[in-house]
Regions:
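Short, solvent-exposed secondary-structure boundary/capping segments
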Residues: 27-35
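Intrinsically disordered, low-complexity, charged/polar segments
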Residues: 35-78
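Internal alpha/beta domain cores that form substrate/cofactor-binding pockets in large enzymes
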Residues: 74-176, 181, 186-200, 208-211, ...
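Short beta-strand-centered aromatic/proline hotspots
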Residues: 15-26
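Short coil-to-beta transition motif at edge beta-strands of beta-rich domains
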Residues: 1-13
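N-terminal accessory regions of nucleic-acid-interacting proteins
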Residues: 5-8, 28, 56-57
Length: 247
């Protein structure tokens, strides 16, 4: 018998993604991706129990080629996430690469109302705006892309420069083109696919630890994410890390 907290996959989708059961009501299980930023529901009889989550994607962690006589100031990150579990995963990732990051768990629809004050409070170099999203092919609509777009626009009212404030926005299947048009430096999802829970954090960390005086290697940074340029895309910009002397 399946229960809340079990790992499962969906038979109707060839068991392609591992989920965690968050709740069960009237024979329907409400699911969240164990690794992908995805929420779904499925009848009990469509689910196969999985014993464990096997992560085949090994995230690449940015590293510094430090010189003993210099000190380094990576860019600061404000990570806004509608999902607390994924937020904590991302904060742990930032901690593992020794980057300063503040995290806020806020529902997608509330972010446009709060983002300006959060930017004023934390004064970040990089803002991540993420959570959950979905593309309905039949209706040609998105679950939460509108809120991401409005949040980006509000942030750009405060700081228009794409180099003074780096914005990384979107979640699974988000409206990539409109997020970029709204003012994001990076966004999901060019091919309307699901993205890994850590993908926004991987890009944010790479930008944080890239030289502020040089343009980033856009393709290389995108290749560090699980699905590459199919899941995330962006514009060429400069990094946010400064180097100083003496140490």
């Amino acid at each position: 018998m399946l229960k809340v907290g079990d790992y499962v996959s969906r038979n109707s989708y060839n068991n392609d993604i591992i989920f965690v059961i968050k709740r069960i009501e009237n024979g329907v299980c409400y699911l969240k991706g164990a690794l992908e930023r995805l929420v779904a529901d499925a009848p009990l009889d469509d689910l196969k129990k999985e014993n464990e989550v096997t992560e085949t994607f090994e995230e690449k962690r940015p590293t510094l080629e430090e010189r003993e006589d210099y000190f380094y100031l990576p860019g600061k990150i404000l990570h806004i996430d509608a999902d607390l579990d994924y937020l904590n995963k991302c904060l742990n990732y930032y901690k593992s690469v020794k980057i300063w990051a503040a995290g806020k768990c806020i529902n997608e629809q509330e972010v446009p109302k709060q983002i300006t004050e959060l930017i004023k409070e934390y004064n970040p170099n990089i803002v991540v705006i993420t959570g959950h999203d979905a593309f309905n092919k039949n209706k040609n609509t998105y679950k939460n892309s509108h809120y991401f777009i409005e949040a980006i626009k509000e942030a750009r009212k405060y700081e228009k420069s794409h180099e003074k404030l780096i914005i990384i926005a979107g979640a699974c299947q988000s409206d990539y083109e409109e997020l970029i048009k709204a003012g994001a430096n990076f966004a999901s999802s060019p091919k309307r696919i699901n993205i890994h829970a850590l993908d926004p954090a991987i890009i944010a960390s790479s930008i944080s630890m890239s030289d502020a005086t040089k343009e980033i290697n856009l393709k290389e940074i995108l290749e560090n994410t699980k699905y590459g340029s199919e899941g995330m895309g962006g514009i060429i910009t400069k990094g946010t890390m400064y180097m100083g002397y003496p140490r």
